[in-house]
Amino acid sequence: MSVGSYYKSSAGGGMVTIQSSSADLQAFQDFAKVVPKAAAAAHRRAINKTLGWLRTHIARAVSRQERIAVAAVRQRLRSYPVTGGAMSGKLWFGLNAIESSRIGRARQTGSGVSVAGRRYQGAFLKQVYGNKPDIWIRTASKHFDADDYPDSTVSSGRGPSSGWVAENGSRFPLAKAKVSLEQARPHFESWVGKADERLLQLLQQELNFELQKYLRS
């Protein structure tokens, strides 16, 4: 028996599963018996539209709460729409800390780096690894605050591990500025409830569309 939409949380994110409850599906059972293919198509479209709706609203909500560019949040959201005979779709949201250089337009100032309303005093914007500049700070700096550089552990080898760079030379070690997304985790349950309501609305619309086509045929 389907309990409707639900979510599962993991260390690195959360997976929302969008599906109709048994009670909702029962209401459309008679129509489904008459035109099963049309009903299945309507159900599939309703779930996929709900996934798109949920992705948009989660991106906006997290963007407002964490002061992160919507485009950066969307990169953490991955939709798995309904295909074939599946009865559910999924939306994955990665909650690992995001590089501060990705949340807006970073700007080097005389005292550090500013981006999306945040200021990293003593930091600098530079391409150290990869092909894009990031926001770094020397861990020996008096301005270094571990809260601004989450998910960082010192690596013993060459190159970045999870935000730190440990190498020989006066420039190192460095820590990369990141923004934690853990504050978004508690919102999953409320998003699932809203998604259930939206799915029911869309399912009614899509079934009505298929019904009108059936009556005209």
Predicted regions and their residues:
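Short, Lys/Arg-rich flexible segments
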Residues: 2-217
